[in-house]
């Protein structure tokens, strides 16, 4: 086979991979939407607040949210079913980006990654058979996500809190001598992810990288599926495994092929958003969920203490998540978010403050609601600290 024939074969393979990728991506988004549907349209009796990125943005009417969400679903069906989905993918990206602006909680890690991949598909001219650039941009994004996901987990909270909590159902069945090895074995999780991210970008170690990535997703599913935890990430893990198999096939190229060749390119955007910007999260300059920090133990955590009067006024779905406390009840914001939206709370001070304000509207006195935010230490300066605010203090801080 001469060089021209080889290039044509590579282009044809890339186009087939791009078509398969768009179908998997659209199905993954549809599954994510279905499992977190209350996040995407207004439901009667919802207490958890919508938090726009900009305060000047108006509240979206419930009827508009249904139409907006329906349009996104229709566009995904068209992306999956049409041979040339560029216009539908571009429309989806535009509508989805605008929709996220009206509620920070919608910027979930899985949605952020899917949105970039849809942008890559929208940027590709489907009349051109060479789809290698969008595929390489998506591949670079996937590798960076593994790398930073592992890096974010290199903190004490992950080993002492996250791992024991997730593994508890299995550890309870093991002898105490083996259960003590949890922290040691937990160290393999971030190392596996970091190695997977690096190996996927090399020809020599790619097979090992693919294997490590697949093992990671199988392990996550074993921790979550049998115990019905956070089911919105189930399709994300299945889709991520599929992305690895599609994007890192034998002819995917070496590390140089994944790096940008032009300043203005999809690969440059992938490198900036997923390769460089996550480093800023360790300085508090970039979002944790935009830096693959889900289940890392490296995000600020918020809890509320509410009085009996406030507890009695909560929706039943939220009331079931209350835990007894010395003064009233405690409510973890993640439990609240799962109860109403089926997604974890977006970790930002603005979201925490707005959630506290929603509870304060049910209070009779400022002390009926207290917000407690525990901020972990940063890698580069900044120690762990706890901030506690009641309803009066929240009014001053806003």
PLM feature spans:
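Alpha-helical membrane-anchoring segments
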Residues: 2-398
